[in-house]
């Protein structure tokens, strides 16, 4: 279905006696056009983004072997479960909920619509700031491989990364238009993951003695472990599942479930490999950006870093797409996306959004802290608290007493985790802000 066809119309869904009318809300972007496999690649691109190069340092170092391995496995299972709850509600009430806020508003009312949009916007904004920091850090890593004059600092590279992201955003009108870029993204992911694994194994074999002890005082350990728990859920969740599900063809629930099963089985294996092997090789000294820890030929490290830069640009576009869709729909962008009028609009709107994101990224370039805070204030509420309560609310009459209790236990537990992780993340940012000035060259 093209953008111009998606105008609050109804379509028939189902076979035989099960045919129902499903209302399609207004949107300027293309929906219902992608196969489940393409959607699976969108999800896998997110889970194996350049963020995976940070998990050895931001998850395994604070949690250690037992906590890290068990935590990742549990986070995988509960994230799959929470995402399936959201996916099953996509056509709840005879309407396709192509935005997270639409679903929340339909179930709870107008206030929940605005609250969910606010949470989601913060979630995606911080994720995108993280991608710009990642791309800038990778760009700096390439620079210092060949020049060690320190003339250019991290904020300069973050600015360059932001410019690249803006150019890409202007050229790709909507999520479905990524097309071949998803294949490019997968190829780029394989490059930096394989390089990181091979060089880590080589370093690990050469350096048999490593320290895996969790560092710091009892109080600092408590805060870093809590922050790492937020990183665990951040690793697996997009916070924009309905927006991604909107692009999949009918039957949307069945096809989305296929995509989710792919993401949480085959899709997580590269992430597991680079996370565990990186920590095995360097122990508690693992950098929050793994390619800064590895040793090897300059050209190989440069190739991996360039791949991380380009993949971050593609990933950012995925996570920024709900914001772009909102702007395009609100201001009535119609017709050929490459018409001069539409190009100028994207230059102003998307360029402005990325400019603000780039400024914040350069101002506070603490990647691990961004991941912890994002997981705490938005991933926990959106993916776990809201998903369980929405499902409970929507399916209340069909749930038995034990199922209702189960969903309420999830709501309470993840609410407590969200508060604790937010406190830990704010403390981490406060500590780093004391140790480093704004626009720091990390």
From Swiss-Prot:
Signal peptide location: none
Membrane topology: Multi-pass membrane protein
GO biological process: proline transport
Keyword annotations from UniProtKB, A to Z: Amino-acid transport, Cell membrane, Membrane, Transmembrane, Transmembrane helix, Transport
Gene Ontology molecular function, alphabetical: L-proline transmembrane transporter activity
Transmembrane segments: 35-55, 58-78, 124-144, 157-177, 178-198, 222-242, 260-280, 302-322, 351-371, 372-392, 411-431
Tissue-level expression: Expressed in vascular tissues of roots, leaves, stems, sepals, petals, stamen and siliques. Expressed in pollen.
Localization of this protein: Cell membrane
One annotated Gene Ontology cellular component of this protein: plasma membrane
Pfam family, one: Aa_trans
Intrachain disulfide bonds: none
Null allele phenotype: No visible phenotype under normal growth conditions.
Major subcellular site: membrane
Assigned protein family: Belongs to the amino acid/polyamine transporter 2 family. Amino acid/auxin permease (AAAP) (TC 2.A.18.3) subfamily.
Entry function: Proline transporter that mediates proline and glycine betaine transport. May be involved in long-distance transport of proline and required for phloem loading, retrieval of proline leaking from the phloem, or in xylem-to-phloem transfer. When expressed in a heterologous system (yeast), imports D- and L-proline, glycine betaine and GABA across the plasma membrane. Has the same affinity for D- and L-proline.
Other information: Treatment with toxic concentrations of proline reduces shoot growth and root elongation in wild-type plants, while plant lines over-expressing PROT1 stop growing shortly after unfolding of cotyledons.
Protein name: Proline transporter 1
Name of the gene encoding the protein in the UniProt record: PROT1
